Amino acid sequence: MIKLENLTKQFVQKNGQTFNAVDNVNLNVPEGEMCVLLGPSGCGKTTTLKMINRLIAPSGGKIFINGEDTTDLDTVTLRRNIGYVIQQIGLFPNMTIEENITVVPRMLGWDKARCKERATELMAMVALDPKRFLNRYPKEMSGGQQQRIGVIRA
């Protein structure tokens, strides 16, 4: 579960004025749900995501993951346990689809069989046949198919 309470990010511009990039965002994403931040360019979507995974610090407000305030969490552990998809798909072109999907599980020490099982399960969730696609490379898939891989990798 992700909960944002009055999340704010302000930047000081060159002229000394303060710019509110994110202004008191409140959001609840229940466990197991996907959430889409949709809006025009420059409205704070990416800034909000960067605050959730602590690439940048909020100016105000709180971020909770599974009920725990993330302020004092270890950033490496935090980032390994959350994922998000950005507009740019960001698949590794030199890795197969299976390797792309299992990057984080392999970093966490999962064995090969468990990784394969999880990749197969995730492929089925996005209506892509694992037998057809797991051994392919991103360039061998359409943009929409690649985007789905990005979603399940997150």
Label every model-predicted segment.
Residues 69-83, 107, 112-113:
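ABC ATPase NBD coupling module
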Residues 98-106, 116, 120:
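Short helical segment in ABC ATPase nucleotide-binding domains corresponding to the A-loop/adjacent helical element
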Residues 136-141, 145:
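Conserved ABC ATPase signature
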Residues 151:
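Hydrophobic anchor residue at the start of the ABC signature
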